[in-house]
């Protein structure tokens, strides 16, 4: 087991939602094992060196020469071996796989979020499937995406008085219409008034400037009472943790697994709102159906609905931290037993 003072290295990811997921894992590890969270930007010098490195580390005969030559392969925030030995490294996406292996070879316990596409599973200590994916034999499944939101730091659920609308945006074959944004805002305004809640609205990097203009125009034309409008393209978006801190109810566009997971982590009553049909991407639709089956969310078609009946909607009870940390302890124990054998 890593010493209490060992750090958690987060391999930087350029996609905001995925980076937040990694920080959620890192926060959970920090609270359980201590240490500091360090975000590192590690890159291989070239594709050729990536291929060479992957080939070399799979050879059966290794020697201490690795301690002297591995730094040749990478550039960026390269920590010293003594910093990494016994620590954690968390990564995601294809770009994070080899940097995670690199730090793992220096002695870190490696955790990768998402399917491994470039390296064998035996090179990573623990692989976590993305929510909604069919879990493979070598992968661990969480009930929702990791989040850095700490529910204990939020207002008690019964004292919250916000209704938060969080828009994701177009993805893959999914393109939201103007009508979707306008109907969602209408439903949110009606729900906020009926439940005596304060209306707050936020967007994300996928919403797009044009759709943010649609949102602004609709609010102005209908004179909606909006307490806070946080637009991504105006660099005006606080963290989801902050926005959800007083949210009794969260209406979130259905394609955003990350934002839905954050609402669940914040114990907000969560409504996933879609246009005509659930997103076609199987991973997303499977995640939504799992949460619906477990009574964690409500699914609403914005186009065909005149209002949202929230009376039966319960506060979610899903937790990803407990099963995650239990799995980490099991994996650590197995690794330590193998190392001692």
Identify the role of each PLM range.
Residues 10-140:
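Active-site and donor-binding regions of nucleotide-sugar-utilizing enzymes
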């Amino acid at each position: 087991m890593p010493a209490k003072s060992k750090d958690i290295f987060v391999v930087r990811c350029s996609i905001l939602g995925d980076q937040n997921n990694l920080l959620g894992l890192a926060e959970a590890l920090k609270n359980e094992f201590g240490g500091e969270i360090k975000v590192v930007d590690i890159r291989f010098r070239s594709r050729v060196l990536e291929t060479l490195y992957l080939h070399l580390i799979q050879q059966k005969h290794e020697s201490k020469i690795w301690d002297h030559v591995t730094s040749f392969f990478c550039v960026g925030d390269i920590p010293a071996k003594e910093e990494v030995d016994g620590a954690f490294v968390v990564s995601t996406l294809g770009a994070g796989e080899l940097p995670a292996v690199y730090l793992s070879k220096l002695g870190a316990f490696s955790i990768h979020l998402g399917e491994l596409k470039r390296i064998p599973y035996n090179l990573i200590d623990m692989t976590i499937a993305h929510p909604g994916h069919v879990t493979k034999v070598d992968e661990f499944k969480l009930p929702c995406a990791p989040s850095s939101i700490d529910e204990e730091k939020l207002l008690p659920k019964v004292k919250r008085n916000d209704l938060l609308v969080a828009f994701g945006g177009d993805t893959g074959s999914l393109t939201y219409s103007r009508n979707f944004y306008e109907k969602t805002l209408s439903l949110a305004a009606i729900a906020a008034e009926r439940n005596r809640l304060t209306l707050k609205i936020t967007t994300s990097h996928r919403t797009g400037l044009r759709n943010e203009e649609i949102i602004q125009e609709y609010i102005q034309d209908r004179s909606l009472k909006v307490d806070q409008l946080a637009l991504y393209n105006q660099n005006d978006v606080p963290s989801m943790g902050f926005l959800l801190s007083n949210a009794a109810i969260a209406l979130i566009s259905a394609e955003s697994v990350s934002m839905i997971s954050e609402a669940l982590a914040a114990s907000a009553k969560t409504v996933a709102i879609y246009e005509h049909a659930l997103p076609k991407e199987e991973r997303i639709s499977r995640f939504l159906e799992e949460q619906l089956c477990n009574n964690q969310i409500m699914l609403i078609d914005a186009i065909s609905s005149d209002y949202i009946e929230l009376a039966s909607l319960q506060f979610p009870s899903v937790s990803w931290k407990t099963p995650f940390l239990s799995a980490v302890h099991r994996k650590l124990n197995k690794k330590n037993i193998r190392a001692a054998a």
